[in-house]
Amino acid sequence: MNKRGALLSLLFLSASVSAFAASTESKSVKFPQCEGLDAAGIAASVKRDYQQNRIVRWADDQKKVGQADPVAWVNVQDVVGQNDKWTVPLTVRGKSADIHYQVIVDCKAGKAEYKPR
């Protein structure tokens, strides 16, 4: 009986660690054309990209926030960047929880990385 309990405990611990690791990994994605945009334009592009492209594909985000159409926003004053490389703090609010991302956008490369924060 003790072996079974220890095995179940180990299995549960392993699953918990895997779930935590999955939720803290960054996600690299293709990003639409954004060269020459200012901070407000980049903020709008990141918000639009998340709402139209990411939330529909990232089931773990839908599950965490508790809905398929959460509210996403960016405070433009917190957007920093130069030479078409930007750091954008994104907040996603749903029924169950909030998700916070630091989105690193490289306009020249056409890529973005969503890092949980």
UniProtKB/Swiss-Prot annotation:
Disulfide bonds: 34-107
A GO cellular component annotation in the UniProt record: extracellular region
Segment forming the signal sequence: 1-21
Domain of life according to the entry: Bacteria
Keywords annotated in UniProt: Disulfide bond, Secreted, Signal
Chief site of localization: secreted
PROSITE patterns registered for this protein in UniProt: YEBF_CMI
Location relative to the cell: Secreted
The YebF/Cmi domain, residue ranges: 30-117
Pfam families hit by this protein: YebF
HAMAP family, per database record: YebF
Family that this chain belongs to: Belongs to the YebF family.
Name of the molecule in the record: Protein YebF
Lineage: Bacteria, Pseudomonadati, Pseudomonadota, Gammaproteobacteria, Enterobacterales
